[in-house]
């Protein structure tokens, strides 16, 4: 059993703990929160022995071998680095860090300390995403794709009311492309590799983060358009178009349904059964990396490439975070 700790006590942390336990590979051993009351409240639902209000104390503790980080984006890098330096394996929620420089430093730290660093981009681990990748030859010569994820944020009204929620605050390295737009970008890179170039546009809020945007990725023979928003909903599926037909994906982040629409024929449902908690697959992947002591793994290349193009997209749209090095602004 891999003894792990969690940083963050929100809904996504609970989902991860439940699925981590379901893999049969993990045991929750510690919880961190700035508030002991909050840590205790979270721990009441699990048999947890250790509660921490000090990150350094938890990082030094022999009670844990690994940590799951689900804190605000701007804290991901410093917390990841701290635990790697104390020889703990790290699974960090996406995005792994605020920019490419931080991701490079995190990967270097994992290598220096010979510990697994794994970015929690669940989509790449899903059975239906793997099916989607295997099904690409069905469409023949590819010409274009639309990867779409637009979802009205439950915190947007708070922003409109004059509050400053983390979701729309550049101090926390947040915004549309860093949150749900990430799924579109990372999925494209997981399917087709890095583009030749990108052209990005976005509508910025007064806070300085992007509310929504569009990115066109140039792959030479084909293009991929990313559409993302945190201030509006979309009912459109994502679509990959080729000369022999199209692949249609409902809710890209979870690949809820994958269909093949042959040119001139009826649509075929290719969807495979998936666990209701789609975090199960990334939890299993993290456990396997630890068991195999696979410090070097393909996920690191995907994390770096995604960070590289996230950084470039923000450079083009003018979204700047305090974490960015302003003497060499957003260089990719």
Regions found by a protein language model. Name each.
Residues 124-195:
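Predominantly a Rossmann-like dinucleotide-binding segment in NAD(P)-dependent oxidoreductases
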Residues 66-68, 104, 285-332:
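C-terminal helix-rich "cap/oligomerization" subdomain common to oxidoreductases
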Residues 46-109:
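Beta-loop-alpha module in the N-terminal Rossmann-like domain of NAD(P)-dependent dehydrogenases
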Residues 270-284:
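Active-site loop of classical SDR/Rossmann-like NAD(P)-dependent oxidoreductases
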Residues 105-123, 141-144:
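Rossmann-fold dehydrogenase core element
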């Amino acid at each position: 059993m891999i003894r792990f700790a969690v940083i963050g006590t929100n809904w996504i942390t609970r989902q991860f703990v439940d699925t981590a336990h379901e893999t049969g590979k993990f045991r929750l051993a510690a919880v961190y929160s700035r508030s002991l009351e909050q840590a205790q409240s979270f721990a009441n639902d699990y048999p947890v022995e250790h509660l921490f209000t000090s990150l350094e104390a938890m990082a030094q503790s022999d009670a844990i071998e690994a940590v799951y980080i689900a804190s605000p984006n701007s804290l991901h890098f410093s917390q990841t680095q701290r635990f790697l330096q104390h020889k703990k394996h790290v699974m960090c929620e996406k995005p792994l860090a605020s920019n490419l420089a931080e991701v490079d430093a995190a990967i270097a730290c994992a290598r220096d300390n010979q510990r697994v660093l794994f970015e929690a981009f669940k989509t790449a681990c899903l059975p239906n995403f793997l099916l989607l990748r295997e099904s690409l030859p069905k469409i023949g010569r590819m010409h274009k794709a639309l990867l779409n994820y637009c979802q009205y944020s439950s915190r947007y009204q708070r922003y409109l009311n004059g509050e400053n929620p983390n979701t729309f605050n550049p101090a926390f390295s947040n915004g549309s492309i860093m949150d749900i737009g990430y799924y579109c970008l990372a999925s494209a890179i997981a399917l087709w590799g890095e583009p030749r170039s990108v052209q990005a546009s976005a509508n910025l809020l007064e806070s300085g983060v992007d509310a929504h945007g569009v990115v066109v990725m140039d792959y030479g023979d084909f293009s991929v358009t990313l559409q993302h928003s945190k201030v509006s909903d979309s009912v459109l599926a994502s679509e990959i178009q080729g000369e022999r037909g199209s692949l249609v994906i409902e809710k890209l982040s979870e690949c809820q349904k994958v269909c093949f629409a042959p040119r001139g024929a009826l649509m075929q449902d290719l969807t495979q059964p998936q666990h209701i908690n789609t975090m199960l697959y990334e939890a299993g992947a993290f456990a396997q990396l630890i068991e195999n002591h696979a410090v070097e793994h393909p996920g690191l290349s995907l994390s770096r490439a995604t960070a590289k193009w996230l950084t470039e997209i923000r450079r083009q749209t003018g979204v700047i975070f305090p974490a960015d090095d302003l003497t060499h602004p957003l260089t990719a």
